Curated annotation (Swiss-Prot):
This is 4-hydroxy-2-oxo-heptane-1,7-dioate aldolase. Its cofactor is a divalent metal cation. InterPro entries: Aldolase/citrate-lyase_domain (IPR005000), HKHD_aldolase_ent (IPR023701), HpaI (IPR012689), HpcH-HpaI_aldolase (IPR050251), Pyrv/PenolPyrv_kinase-like_dom (IPR015813), Pyrv_kinase-like_dom_sf (IPR040442). Substrate binds at residues 147, 174-175. The record marks 84 as: Increases basicity of active site His. The active site is at 45 (proton acceptor). Pathway: Aromatic compound metabolism; 4-hydroxyphenylacetate degradation; pyruvate and succinate semialdehyde from 4-hydroxyphenylacetate: step 7/7. GO terms for biological process: 4-hydroxyphenylacetate catabolic process; phenylacetate catabolic process. GO terms for molecular function: 4-hydroxy-2-ketopimelate aldolase activity; metal ion binding. It comes from Klebsiella pneumoniae subsp. pneumoniae (strain ATCC 700721 / MGH 78578). It comes from the Bacteria. Belongs to the HpcH/HpaI aldolase family.
Length: 265
């Protein structure tokens, strides 16, 4: 077993991603052929559940793009189900401290290293027990990315980085800017300073920094600073803005939209 996304991060190869929020296997497959290194299937802010995640994993599987799945919460039960349907790389939201980071890691590991329940006869992940010795190989194939999104998490970042099994740390600029008192303005200088400092700390600890940023100039800046997994857009935004722009060229019904150059998404 291997995890190409995890291998790329370990090798220090920057990975460019796209956020998926349409909850559609059809659009997921369409975007899997677009050339992104990874695609984030969002279960926190998009109305995904285990069955919809499963169909998107199946749709992406034939393509080079690697799936990353975000559960709605740092919940071992939900994580167990996502792993069983085939997720190998998880982006765990709102991790505040080392204890919560350890919980996320343990949820992805079979005992004695963790608390993942054994049900491989029922699991797509093991090809229904057709993967030889799956239970002894699976732990090493897991990639755990934790999200830091508050001032408390930033304060605890050194301890989070010390947690064995955390492969990367994703900085959530939207929630972080809100927590810092600059909601809706992730480009505020205080927020940007915090993000840049966090990227440097994460790299110095030998982990992979990640972020989502639709502003092209900022996304490139984060890559220059050493971010290794950077999502540069969102499927819902691409569809909405593209449709609005097309309508505006032919009708008088142009919709007022958010300036994406000032937004995370």
């Amino acid at each position: 077993m291997n995890n190409a996304f995890k291998d790329a991060l370990k090798a220090g190869r920057p990975q460019i991603g796209l956020w998926l929020g349409l909850c559609s296997s059809y659009s997921a497959e369409l975007l899997a052929g677009a050339g992104f290194d990874w695609l984030l299937i969002d279960g926190e802010h998009a109305p995904n559940n285990v069955p919809t995640v499963l169909t998107q994993l199946q749709a992406i599987a034939p393509y080079p793009s690697q799936p990353v799945v975000r559960p709605s919460w740092n919940d071992p039960v939900q994580i167990k189900q996502l792993l069983d349907v085939g997720a190998q790389t998880l982006l765990v939201p709102m991790v505040q401290n080392a204890e919560e980071a350890r919980l996320a890691v343990r949820a992805t590991r079979y005992p004695p290293a963790g608390i993942r329940g054994v049900g491989s006869a029922l699991a797509r992940a093991s090809r229904w027990n057709r993967v030889p010795d799956y239970i002894h190989q699976a732990n090493d194939a897991m990639c755990v990315l934790v999200q830091i999104e508050t001032r408390e998490a930033l304060k605890n970042l050194p301890q989070i980085l010390d947690v064995d099994g955390v492969d990367g740390v994703f900085i959530g600029p939207a929630d972080l800017s809100a927590d810092m008192g600059h909601g809706g303005n992730p480009q505020h200088p205080e927020v940007q300073a915090a993000i840049e400092d966090a990227i440097q700390q994460i790299r110095q600890a030998g982990k992979a920094p990640g972020i989502l940023m639709a502003n092209e100039q900022l996304a490139k800046r984060y890559l220059e600073l050493g971010a290794l997994f950077v999502a540069v857009g969102v499927d819902t935004t691409l569809l909405a803005r593209g449709a609005e722009a097309l309508a505006a060229r032919f009708t008088h019904n142009a919709t007022t939209t958010t300036d994406n150059n000032k937004s995370v998404y």
